Each structure stands twice: as C-alpha cells, then as structure tokens.
Amino acid sequence: MRDSIAQTLSNRTFQVIFLVYSSLLIFLGRQLDRGITNFDDAYYAQKAKEIFLSDSLWVVLLKNTPTFDNPPLPFWLTGLAYKVFGVSGYAAVFSSSIFGVLTIYLTYSLCSYLYKDNWIAFFAAFVLLFPGMFLDSSRRGMLDITLAFFVTAAMYGLIKGLKDKKFYLLYGVMTGCAVLTKSVLGFFPIVIGVVFMFWHGGFKKLFDFGYLAGISVAILVGCSWYAMNWYIFGEGFIKSHFNDGHMKLIQDSYLEGSLLYLLGYFKDMMKNYWPWFPVAVVGTFLFAKRSFRDKDVHSMFLFLWVSIPFLIMSTSRNQTLRYLFMIFPALAMITSHTIAGWLRETHKDKTLPWMFGIVVATVLVVNVTPAQVKVSLNYNSAEVRRDIASFVHVNTPPRQAVNFYKLTHWNPTWALMFYSDRSVGDIIWDPEGLLERIEKKPRQAWLTNVWEFRDLEKNFPGRLYLIYANRKFAYFTSQKNRKSVIYDFSNIDLPVVR
C-alpha cells in the first residue's frame, strides 16, 4: 500500500496535475469578494479598463490621458479578462494568477529537463510556492508575476535551444513579451543569454544564427511599443518613459550617502526568504563553483540567471523584492538541487507526502477558512468599493471629477476610480479654501476622512451636506446642492463593486 502511494506521488503526470490544479485553487480561490488594493492593483486595473475602452491598444491611458510608465501587454491581457468576466476585481487579478500557475509549471518542467529527477522538480515548484511572497503576488493584479513567467519561458527556450534551435524563437518571443510587460527589465534574458552563450561556447555559440535570430525577434517584438509611441508622441515619450525614476538603475544620487544600500536586496532576502535563504546562499555558491571549475552548463545557466539580475538590480536605490521574482524560479531550482544532494533517497520519499500535505492544507486555508494571513486574503478597499463608490458614481456626473479634502494624491485615488468610474479632481488642504470652492461651485462633491468632516461640521455648521459616510470616509457636498443628491439606485447601472 505504501509503495503504491509513494509510486503515485512520484509519478510525473500526477505531480503536474496536482501542482496545476492546486495552484489554480490557491491563486484564484476566495477572489470574488476580496477586492483589490489601491497600491498598485487598482492603479493597473484602471489602466487596463481605460485601454480596454479606448480606440488604441498601443497608447496606455490613465484619466483619459496618455501615460508612458508601463508598456501595454499586461493591460491587453487584463482587458481580455474583462471581456470574459466583466470589469471586476476578479478579472483584474485573473491573468496574474494564471501566469503564477504557469510559472509553477514551467519551473517544474524546466527543472525536470535539467536534472531528470521528479523529486527535484516537484521540490523546486514547492520552494517557489512557499514562502508566501510569490503566492501572495500571484493573487494580486500587479506586473511582477507576469514578468516572472515571460522571463522563465524565455530561459526555458534558451536552454532548450542548445539542442533544438527552434526554441530560440520561443526565447525571442518570450523576451519580447517580457519587455512589453515591464520595459527594460524584460531585457534581462538577452543579457543573461549573451553572457551564458559566450561562457558556454565562445563566439561560435554567441554568433550562432539561430540564437541571433532569437535576439532579433526579441528586439522586434519588445521594441514595438517604444517605436509606436515614439512615432505618435516623439521625444516627449522618450523623456517621459526613460527619465522616470523607476526606469533608472543608476540614480543621480548614486554616490551620495552610504553605499550599504547595495546590500538592500540581500537584506530583504535574508528577512523574507525563509526557510530557504541559507540553502539558497550555499547553493548559489556551489553552482558558481561548478560553473567556474567544471564548466557545467546547467550550473552556468542557473547561476547567471540568479546573479546577473540580482547584481544589476542591487545598484538601484528603488529596491522592491517583488522586482526580483524573475529569479525566483532559478533560486528554487538551485535550492531544490542542493537539498537533494544532501538527502538520501529514503529521506526524499518520506518528505514527499509532507509536501503534498502542505499544499493541500494551503488550498483548504485559502478556500474554506476566513483566515486573512496575507494582503490578498484581506478585504481590500472595502470602504471604497462597497458603498462610497456607488454614491460617487450616481452623484458625480461622468465629466465632473470628485474632489479630495485632506486626502493624498495617491490614496484612495485608484481604488475610487476603478470602482466608481469617476476621476479624481482637485485636492484642497485648508478649510477656508474648501469653503471658498464650495461657494463658487456648490454642485461639486467632495471626499475626505470622516474625522475631518466632523471637524468641518463643527467649525462650519449648516454649510455642508453629508451624502454618505462609513467608518473611514465621508462623501459630502454643499447644503445648496442637497436637493440634487440621488439616493434612488433603482434605474441606475452601477459599476463594479467586487
């Protein structure tokens, strides 16, 4: 009986089906009523909604104005999800979740291809899934998981292209898609590939026709958005996109202050990549050793995949750990292979049921319990999407923006825009300026923190009319506009509230 169970758990087909099905349940489970966060999920979801409703797929819009900080591919994919599921928080995270599942599968498949060992492949997928950073981000509507998938797919095409040159085409297309996902960060497969090909086979490999064709495809696909927007907007696009703070690896303040910031990503990994961090460090060292001493192709491949993005990204002062998700599949494979070398076969057989059990337990926690242990399991933007957004939608005309009083430019701007279908206008910080604006334009509506509204009521009695308030926000207008306030929703199609 035990032998049959162990044989089933070690079967490649069973492992693949289990990983794909479990990942789908983990990443898409309990998503219908969670909502999306203001940062950065609603920001990207709003962009996807606007490009979905616009006439041009190549121009990314925000507040109906061209914006150049992000390429359009993730928004195209989210737009397709909107087409299928309707505009909702679920559709906003759908493509990211699917790419999370595909990255899990690709990690398993690539590791199996490299080492021909189902245990190492399954454990690599397990390491990628846990701890929860990758899991949590796969349940959110950001760009990093999508980038991780395209980079992983590109690296898969690169290593398989050594034996079958047709895979260099996959390498090129996936690299191009990575660029269309997150701009210059998507070029890392080319940088890694050039170093790897030269290290592995010198100029002969580097100038292989199939490989150069793959790079050409990558540049053609990846640079298409640059070319289209440069053609439409000229130098304004170039300056706006490439001078953005997020695009600069080496900042103007590079030499100012302590250079200890170069260790920022290492510190973040040390805090968050447990329990695998010590093994990942030792494993990376061992892979580097085999790369330089033994010229082992697979060790070179994974070592460069991890080290090149890590070292280059560490030079940036804009360090966020999720930007490194593109190296997490390689780290998972290094960690898995290293631990496998330390264990006997009997120990591996004993650990396999535990890994399956942990994955099943996670599926149950996500889908059948109310546990809120990660951002993506919390109720996000609840104060906006469940009630305020509906009142803003019906009481703010489509061409009129809702204004903020003592709220920041960023919060809750994007969640409010996504859930109410209304844009955000001016921000006023002083009460006298607010009263002056209300006197001039009494039909305008305003949003503020509820405690700020209580102070306004106290200091200016009879001047303001509260349309609706919850525990966090108050939505109000002038007393002169009271009769125009709408509370009847019976004949109104409300925007998304989930």
Task: Indicate where each model-derived feature is located.
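Transmembrane-helix signature of polytopic, membrane-embedded enzymes
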Residues: F14-V20, T107-F130
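Short periplasmic/luminal acceptor-recognition loop of GT-C membrane glycosyltransferases, typified by
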Residues: L24, V366-K483, P495-V496
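Extracytosolic helix-loop segments that constitute the early lumenal/periplasmic catalytic or substrate-binding loops
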Residues: L24-L28, Y43-P66, L73-W76, L80, ...
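Short acidic/glycine- and proline-prone juxtamembrane loop motifs at membrane-interface regions
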Residues: V93, D136-T146
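Transmembrane-helix motifs of polytopic, lipid-linked glycan transferases
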Residues: F94-Y115, A153
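Membrane-interface transmembrane helices that cradle and orient dolichyl/undecaprenyl
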Residues: S112-L114, N118, A154-L170, I339
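Transmembrane-lumen/periplasm boundary regions of multi-pass, lipid-linked membrane glycan transferases
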Residues: C177, G186-H298, W305-R317
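Hydrophobic/aromatic-rich transmembrane helices and adjacent perimembrane loops
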Residues: R317-R344
